[in-house]
Amino acid sequence: MHTVKLLCVVFSCLCAVAWASSNSQPCHSPPLTSGTMKVVSTGGHDLASGEFSYDSKANKFRFVEDTAHANKSSYMDVLIHFEEGVLYEIDSKNESCKKETLQFRKHLMEIPPDATHESEIYMGSPSVTEQGLRVRLWNGKLPELHAHYSLSTTSCGCLPVSGSYYGDKKDLLFSFFGVETEVDDPQVFVPPAYCEGVTFEEAPDDHSFFDLFHD
């Protein structure tokens, strides 16, 4: 028990040192993260809820919507290779695939390098053990989309907690739950074989990650 407490103290100290030396520069996500992502509109409409996987080194993202989330005729399964500017919309049931160009490559899984650090706060209680979470708040603009965003990440670890996107056409709220620093199956970042040979569909220059979520 004493060993566990000592490790917690050491870990907290290391986090404090890392925070002090960061000079409020944008932190970087762990190499691999996975968990549940929920997206709603500011009007309160549920837009999507499902499992995400993110590879920060290769900048690849997979999101598979929970089929039990809502009464829908189709469910989202997308794979995005941001560095390559490719978005795959996958239909595993019918083994079909749609492949689009993605010119705009910023997203909420990674803090943009030009983000502004707003503050550091505690959610919950800072004085009661395991009853609080220290987070850092970031914000910035996406002029190409005529939009702005805000993000909150854990102070130590840079795990996503929540995010918001405010644009001319839509406002979105993102929440992240049960985030782990691993991905069970690395193959989630590999497009299925039936996506090979599919012709690219050209998309507008402002086509983005945020266009995936709509009523």
What are these regions (language model features)?
Residues 49-115, 165-175:
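An acidic-aromatic
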Residues 29, 89, 99-101, 158-160, ...:
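Disulfide-rich extracellular modules and peptides
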Residues 38-41, 66-67, 74-76, 125, ...:
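Intrinsically disordered, low-complexity segments enriched in polar/charged residues with Gly/Pro
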Residues 106-134:
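Acidic, glycine-rich loop-and-strand cores that form catalytic or ligand-binding grooves
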Residues 131-198:
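Gly/Pro-enriched, hydrophobic low-complexity segments
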Residues 29-33, 53-62, 78-86, 131-133, ...:
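Short, solvent-exposed coil/turn segments at beta-strand boundaries
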Residues 1-60, 71, 94-95, 125-128, ...:
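N-terminal leader/targeting segments and the immediate start of mature chains
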Residues 20-25, 103-108, 123-125, 163:
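Intrinsically disordered, low-complexity boundary segments flanking structured domains
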